[in-house]
Design a protein with these regions (language model features):
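Short amphipathic alpha-helices and their capping/turn segments at secondary-structure boundaries
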Residues: 1-9, 40-50, 126-129, 153-159, ...
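N-terminal active-site segment of His-dependent metallophosphoesterases
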Residues: 1-73, 410
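Domain-start "cap" segments at the beginnings of catalytic or binding domains
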Residues: 2-29, 233, 239-264
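Short coil/turn segments at beta-strand junctions that form active-site/ligand-binding loops
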Residues: 3, 54, 88, 164, ...
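His/Asp/Glu-rich metal-coordinating catalytic cores
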Residues: 20, 26, 55, 66-217, ...
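Surface-exposed alpha-helical segments enriched in charged/polar residues
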Residues: 46-49, 81, 189-192, 283, ...
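Conserved residues at the C-terminal ends of beta-strands
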Residues: 59, 202, 301
Length: 453
């Protein structure tokens, strides 16, 4: 029989994230975004106190960069101090963004904070606050340097002779998530076999529970930082019962939420219809999350004659400027809750044409559309790769472009082909251009800073 207790599991705080592309934004919007990671940390501290947790575990990447800003370090120390004043211990590890060898303030950690080293998984005992009883063994290992490519999971082991609940802190990529760098790679099988009761993971910013016996948990980051980090962000509060089973409750911590919303132009004939649909969607978002600032990217899909306006007259860029002007005024009035900042319009729509007829045509456009259709099938991926490689070969002669293009995913290349097909339809219909209206943020070909893990 175990002694019941409660702890909070968070990871990937990325304090003082720099948010690439901020220079283009109004100062009032920019400053709120820059403050968002600190605000999420503040909400984490309040949650730990309100939920009366026995301790907090943080699974790496406290700071966004190894040479963490002075502000980031001081704000984190302040947060630790606040937890200490409430008698809440903290157990933490450092990850690939904030390794132990990063140049930071040499500050003695308070007595209630345990930082695990980088040589081998260490052990610490956690106690229940109300009576001081030992309730758990916490084990963890930090990144000594930024790049840890060894499987450190297999170096973990239960503390000999202890029957307490065992928690492991690990910052790494379980089962090779291709969206993130493969630091400290391991498999679920590796983790299950080490005999721990709860794996408190960090590194992957998307929240997920990979396994339940034992629990293998990514809480995700506490504050989204790009349209690649959409939806609620926060942490888990975990209740461990007498029978050793754990119950997890997710708590939102973010103050700025990112989302991608799809808007179909099917059947739209006039610009006014499209503008009304966009404005209505923005008000729906505002109504759904009145306590948050939302950053939204619109994916314009479907087919309709309004595509002609989006492609030829730059209607998307014009509306984007107006929407951003309105929300900038709200920001200047400090009306951040309910503010909906439109980040951009990804124009993926097309003209209202008979695509099936075009696919049957013995023409250049028909051939291109058939190629785009083939690209959707797995069997033709190799052929598709050859065609795209040939098309971009001249660009590969430039060293900087070669570096950027080498990091473009297969899915992005498919998007290029789809876009080329629609552009072909557009141009052959007498139009002069189509594309994407962006508003200050951009998905850089090298992945940008937003979704770094």
């Amino acid at each position: 029989v175990m002694i019941p207790f409660r702890f909070l599991h968070a990871a990937d705080l990325h304090l003082d994230s720099r948010f690439a592309g901020l220079a283009h934004l109004p100062a009032a919007v920019r400053s709120y975004l820059r403050e968002s990671t600190f605000a999420a940390l503040g909400r984490l501290i309040c949650l730990a106190i309100k939920e009366n947790v026995d301790f907090v575990v943080i699974s790496g990447d406290i700071y966004d960069v190894s040479d963490a800003s002075l502000q980031g370090q001081l704000r984190f120390q302040e947060a630790l101090k606040e937890l200490g004043e409430q008698g809440i211990p903290v157990f933490l590890i450092h990850g690939n963004h904030d390794p132990l060898d990063g140049p930071r303030l040499v500050a003695e950690m308070p007595e209630h904070v345990t930082v695990f080293g980088g040589d081998a998984p260490g052990y610490a005992t956690a106690h229940r606050r109300r009576d001081g009883q030992e309730v758990a063994i916490v084990s963890g290992i930090s990144y000594p340097t930024a790049k840890v490519t060894a499987n450190t999971a297999v170096t973990f082991s239960r503390k000999p002779g202890s029957e307490l609940f065992h928690i492991a802190l690990l910052h790494g990529n379980v089962d090779g998530d291709l969206q993130h760098e493969t630091y400290s790679p391991c498999s679920r099988k590796d983790l299950i076999g080490q005999g721990f009761d709860y794996w408190a993971l960090g590194h992957i910013h998307k929240r997920s529970i990979l396994y339940e016996k034992p629990y293998i948990v990514y809480p995700g980051n506490i504050q989204g930082r790009s349209v690649k980090e959409t939806g609620p962000k926060g942490c888990y509060v975990v209740d461990v019962r007498e029978n050793g089973e754990a119950a997890l409750q997710f708590h939102e911590l973010d103050i700025v939420r990112w989302q991608v919303t799809e808007l179909s132009i099917d059947g739209m004939e006039h610009e006014a219809q499209w503008v009304e649909a966009v404005e209505r969607r923005i008000e729906d978002i505002r109504e759904a999350d009145p306590h948050l600032m939302t950053v939204v990217r619109f994916r314009l899909t479907g087919r309709g004659n309004v595509h002609r306006l989006l492609a030829e007259k730059g209607a998307a860029a014009d509306l984007l400027s107006e929407l951003q002007r309105r929300e900038a005024l709200r920001a200047e009035r400090k009306e951040y809750p309910g503010l909906v900042w439109t980040e951009g319009f990804a124009v993926e729509s097309g003209l209202a044409v008979d695509r099936s007829r075009l696919l049957q045509e013995d023409s250049f456009l028909g051939e291109m559309l058939r190629l785009a259709e083939k690209g959707e099938g797995e069997g033709s991926r190799e052929e598709l790769e050859d065609i795209i490689s040939s098309a971009i070969a001249p660009l590969m002669e430039n060293r900087e472009l070669r570096r950027l293009l080498s990091q473009v995913s297969e899915e992005e290349k498919l998007d290029w082909l789809r876009g080329a097909a629609e552009l072909g339809i557009t141009l052959l219909s007498g139009l002069e251009g189509a594309g994407e209206a962006e508003g200050g943020f951009r998905d850089k070909p090298d992945g940008g800073r937003y979704d770094e893990d």
